[in-house]
From Swiss-Prot:
May act as receptor. Negatively regulates TCR-mediated CD4(+) T cell proliferation and activation, possibly by binding an unknown ligand on the T cell surface. Enhances Toll-like receptor-mediated production of pro-inflammatory cytokines by macrophages and neutrophils. This is T-cell-interacting, activating receptor on myeloid cells protein 1. N-glycosylated. The gene is TARM1. Disulfide bonds join 49-97, 146-196. It is found in: Cell membrane.
Length: 271
């Protein structure tokens, strides 16, 4: 408890006496969430603050307010992890992190970009559907429509989620109770399970339960991969041929220079 209080006291003194935020002397840190920034209630999330700087201490803020707990795990590698356990709706919000040098002068960094942590389940589940049936051919387009049931009179945002991706892949503000998300020029990497949700864009950041997942399958026409591979091979072979020709020219010039006798060289000199 005492080391924790001393750490916070040191940080507040650094802010009060040596805040050089924005002078560019310290790089801005990055803040990420694992396993996701959109999680159900009672789950655990790890917020990781990272910077290339060394010999620093980290601080986590929520809505601009310093969080006195949980205590970060300081690391000599320029990173700290903040473990948020048994999350409730009240834990949703905008998080940032920053750091300061442990040694004098205690320079304070800029804060990271805002990470919005959403705890789902407070609002009713939306419905996700697609206009395409079956599988989608690579290079095509997929439209996913997300529709909510609630009539809310506060600003909201729709989010498209993909299983295995730690943050929403698309965000859109609706004009009504539904919104269309588009996946353009799809590839095999776009295949997977998708869901959608919506949330309030202001505090308390209430969020809906995610919709049921919808699987998107992408087929690659036969020969497409081999054609691209062949084209790549042709390009590589062409570049290799150009390099060989240039090297050959240098070798010929070097050989000619070594085999021309001094007398022959003098013969080319003007009288």
């Amino acid at each position: 408890m005492i080391p924790k209080l001393l750490s916070l006291l040191c940080f507040r003194l650094c802010v009060g006496q040596g805040d050089t935020r924005g002078d560019g002397s310290l790089p801005k840190p990055s803040l990420s969430a694992w396993p996701s920034s959109v999680v159900p209630a009672n789950s655990n999330v790890t917020l990781r603050c990272w910077t290339p700087a060394r010999g620093v201490s980290f601080v986590l803020r929520k809505g601009g307010i310093i969080l006195e707990s949980p205590k970060p795990l300081d690391s000599t590698e320029g990173a700290a992890e903040f473990h948020l356990n048994n999350l409730k709706v009240r834990n949703a919000g905008e998080y940032t992190c920053e750091y300061y040098r442990k040694a004098s002068p205690h320079i304070l960094s800029q804060h990271s970009d805002v990470l919005l942590l959403l705890v789902t389940g407070h609002l009713s589940k939306p419905f996700l559907r697609t206009y395409q049936r079956g599988t989608v051919t690579a290079g095509g387009r997929v439209t996913l429509q997300c529709q909510k049931r609630d009539q809310l009179f506060v600003p909201i945002m729709f989010a498209l989620l993909k299983a295995g991706t730690p943050s929403p892949i698309q965000l859109q503000s609706p004009a009504g109770k539904e919104i269309d998300f588009s996946l353009v020029d799809v590839t095999a990497g776009d295949a997977g399970n998708y869901s959608c949700m919506y949330y309030q864009t202001k505090s308390p950041f209430w969020a809906s339960e995610p919709s049921d997942q919808l699987e998107i399958l992408v087929t690659v026409p036969p020969g497409t991969t081999s054609s691209n591979y062949s084209l790549g091979n042709f390009v590589r072979l062409g570049l290799a041929a150009v390099i060989v020709v240039i090297m050959g020219a240098f070798l010929v010039e070097a050989w000619y220079s070594r085999n021309v006798s001094p007398g022959e060289s003098e013969a080319f000199k003007p009288e």
